[in-house]
């Protein structure tokens, strides 16, 4: 939380903490790298189709940060179509990476940290059981005047129940078994749980 | 992070995570209590002079949450005066409570989570060495159209260097001593450090 030297830190635009070990922002530029170092990131979820810039890749290598790229196009014709440009399956894949604590601390970003990032954080909040009014309030806080009704509809209709049930099923199953297990048996259960988590990661609604 | 039942959670208005163990919001209402429970708060920093409502006090007692109240008046004549209504000494006292990890997880709130809360979070960001542009961006994200130039000036002119130096001095002193100390001597140092932290808590610029 506290810096030891007097160098002023510059977070990326639209930076914020989402939850413990989860951050969001617009595209990080080199002047933001000293700040990003303080977060001790383990991974970055990048939501644009454009290749990651070389100097950003260099920074990731130097900090041993894993890049998860989910190429979602920025919206082209904002007013001409009522359909969302956000693909559900891609956001679901990104959500699975996002809620896996082994990837934390993680930074989600797109270009401006408003729409694509806002949609992913929105479905995370639904996964966390937030009411829709609060999810929308948060989306709008970051999108401001650029808020899109299609994004709000995307978040509203996105189904997280199946994924949550799948995850809870696995956790509950092993939690119950491990309760009565010996130390050796617990290690075996751990390996089985890892395999089940692979299934969960390939979950499709 | 995850709820185990299907009850939808309703965070207070303008709720957000500020940093690890630090949250901000507008005034929490009873429908927000189930959500607040998930944060496992140890304390609340309340920035208004009005008495805390009985049902909120009841909730705090049931959850064993400590209340720190710093009565700062809401601004009355927004446009007639260039002076800030935020008292520096009070914000400094609140900042000292806020950065003390023994009070974490902590929720900061005022009435709407915009001005008084925005000023306290603003000086925290200066304490964390954030550049002023990023501090202002964050203030404005929550204040929106209600952003006040007097608040931004308050944050800009607030001096955190003295407090930081005082805190770092204590930490550095004991860190160095404890490095070479025996277990028994370390306990003694711990007691002395606690006393020094009292001095720090009474720090006045």
Segments predicted by a language model, with ranges:
Chain A
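Cys-dependent protein tyrosine phosphatase-like superfamily
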Residues: 1-108, 112, 119-205
């Amino acid at each position: 939380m506290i810096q030891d030297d007097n160098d002023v830190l510059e977070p990326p635009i639209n930076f914020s903490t989402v939850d413990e070990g989860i951050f969001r922002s617009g595209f990080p530029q080199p002047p933001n790298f000293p700040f990003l170092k303080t977060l001790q990131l383990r991974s970055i979820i990048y939501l644009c189709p454009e290749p990651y810039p070389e100097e950003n890749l260099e920074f990731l290598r130097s900090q041993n940060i894993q890049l998860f790229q989910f190429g979602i196009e920025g919206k082209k014709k904002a007013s001409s179509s009522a359909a969302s440009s956000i693909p559900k399956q891609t956001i679901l894949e990104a959500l699975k990476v996002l809620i896996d604590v082994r990837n934390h601390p993680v930074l989600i970003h797109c270009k401006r940290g408003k729409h694509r990032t806002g949609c992913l954080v929105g479905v995370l909040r639904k996964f966390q059981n937030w009411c829709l009014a609060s999810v929308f309030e948060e989306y709008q806080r970051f999108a401001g005047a650029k808020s899109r009704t299609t994004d709000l509809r995307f978040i509203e209709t996105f189904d997280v129940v199946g994924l949550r049930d799948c995850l809870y099923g696995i956790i509950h199953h092993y939690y119950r078994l491990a309760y009565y297990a010996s130390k050796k048996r617990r290690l075996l259960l751990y390996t089985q749980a890892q395999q089940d988590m692979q299934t969960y990661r390939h979950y499709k609604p």
